[in-house]
């Protein structure tokens, strides 16, 4: 597996050529290989907003974690990575740089020079990949393949619904509510 950070929009500088990076990324996304994310809806929404298309299966480790342990209190990457990988996210360097620049390390990360974000982003990728190695074994051991595959197969439809919206028959919903209650 490979991890890397390819900055294109940092206000603090250190960006690579946006057009070349997006072309390269699209070449990877158009392959039929499995793409692994944590909280895939967030990343896939950004990818689609950039006008890029994703082929291949999309695996979400957040969904995998919920399927394998529905009673868990938290499904964030840091918590799950500590449990399954034995390490968490690499936030110290990012927080230090953000403090120096006087910005919020999460919501204003783009304002930092890319040099300060690369290690953080790469660690997220490493943690996600490691988490998937554990989750896929859990799914098999708990005989949850069918459930996880259903969730995974529905994901592209959920993304489309988020982007296109969903029509709701309000009158029909109100009638159904009266019937159910």
Q: Which role fits each region the language model picked out?
A:
Residues 146-181:
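Extended, well-ordered alpha-helical scaffold/bundle regions in very large, multi-domain proteins
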Residues 2-140, 150, 158:
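Active-site-proximal helix-loop-helix substrate-binding element of RNase H-like nuclease domains
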């Amino acid at each position: 597996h490979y991890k890397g950070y390819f900055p294109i929009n940092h206000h603090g500088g250190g960006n690579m050529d946006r057009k070349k990076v997006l072309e390269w990324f699209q070449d990877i996304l158009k392959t039929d290989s499995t793409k692994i994310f944590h909280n895939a809806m967030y990343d896939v929404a950004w990818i689609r907003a950039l006008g890029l298309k994703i082929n291949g299966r999309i695996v979400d480790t957040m969904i995998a974690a919920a399927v394998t342990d529905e009673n868990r209190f938290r499904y964030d990457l840091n918590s799950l990575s500590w449990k399954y990988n034995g390490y968490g996210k690499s936030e110290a360097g990012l927080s230090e740089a953000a403090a120096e620049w006087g910005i919020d390390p999460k919501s204003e990360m783009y304002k930092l020079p890319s040099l300060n974000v690369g290690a953080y982003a790469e660690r997220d990728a490493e943690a996600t990949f490691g988490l998937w190695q554990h989750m896929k074994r859990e799914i098999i051991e708990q005989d949850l393949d069918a459930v996880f595959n259903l969730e995974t197969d529905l994901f592209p439809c959920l993304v489309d619904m988020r982007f296109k919206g969903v029509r709701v028959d309000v009158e029909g919903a109100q009638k159904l509510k009266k019937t159910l209650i």
